[in-house]
């Protein structure tokens, strides 16, 4: 992930909302640049999370987690379980962002407590010096208030990425949820996130759900693109296969 950032390449991400380790293990063979296990909007619990992180170890993609909330105990758990990156939902102020980043880092830069458990398995003796400092800290901007405070949030020391969530952002502006950014305030926010990331020398990321939106985001300067939810992508692929063979789809709408 850091190598792609240094080379100014766009990194791919697949959103994991499936709690079955064997399925996630198979998806890891696709070798996306990264995978995000979703704890906010899925049925994945803590026990399952550890199994999914182990399953992702089969591939080369960086294992990441979206938190259910900005909670110190949950941040500590996902990092100790082996997450390489953490996405904090609904970051609306610089103070919230500072607290989030501090909980991801060991002293003197942060307040994370020592006890990495699985971290020692993949990082070994160098975990404290090398791996822990490379944890990706990502602030999810998904409300109008977050956009209003975007510049202060992006300036947070230690933050690696600001990530745009178009669905909830659209709702906060009074629109219906949509991965296609067509509300004027959402399209404006896309440019504002990209510009803020560039000003503060961090990465701009975005959740997309179609090749068209992904290409649009890349053209706007976004260097980290989530290409959709695993369950939805698998459903679409299986439905398309049935339609190609039998000439019709049986997918329930």
Where on the chain are the PLM-derived regions?
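Expand to "…catalyze enediolate/carbanion chemistry for C-C bond making/breaking, isomerization
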Residues: 3-253
């Amino acid at each position: 992930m850091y190598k792609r950032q240094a080379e100014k390449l766009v990194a791919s991400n697949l959103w994991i909302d499936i709690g079955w380790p064997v399925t996630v293990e198979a998806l890891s063979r696709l070798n996306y640049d990264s995978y995000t296990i979703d704890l906010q909007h899925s049925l994945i619990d803590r026990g399952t999370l550890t199994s999914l992180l182990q399953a992702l170890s089969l591939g080369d993609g960086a294992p990441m987690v979206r938190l259910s909330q900005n909670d110190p105990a949950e941040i500590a758990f996902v990092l100790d379980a082996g997450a390489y990156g953490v996405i904090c939902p609904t970051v609306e102020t610089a103070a919230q962002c500072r607290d989030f980043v501090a909980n991801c880092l060991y002293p003197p830069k942060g307040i994370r407590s020592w006890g990495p458990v699985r971290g020692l398995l993949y990082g070994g003796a160098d975990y404290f010096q090398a791996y822990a400092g490379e944890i990706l800290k990502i602030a999810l901007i998904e409300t109008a208030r977050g956009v209003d405070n975007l510049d202060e949030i992006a300036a947070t020391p230690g933050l690696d990425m600001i990530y745009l969530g178009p669905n909830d952002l659209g709702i906060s502006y009074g629109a219906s949820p949509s991965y296609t950014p067509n509300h004027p305030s959402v399209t404006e926010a896309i440019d504002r996130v990209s510009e803020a990331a560039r000003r503060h020398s961090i990465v701009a990321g975005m959740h997309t759900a179609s090749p068209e939106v992904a290409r649009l985001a890349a053209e706007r300067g976004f260097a980290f693109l989530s290409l959709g939810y695993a369950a939805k992508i698998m459903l679409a692929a299986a439905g398309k296969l049935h339609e190609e063979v039998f000439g019709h789809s049986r997918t329930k709408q």
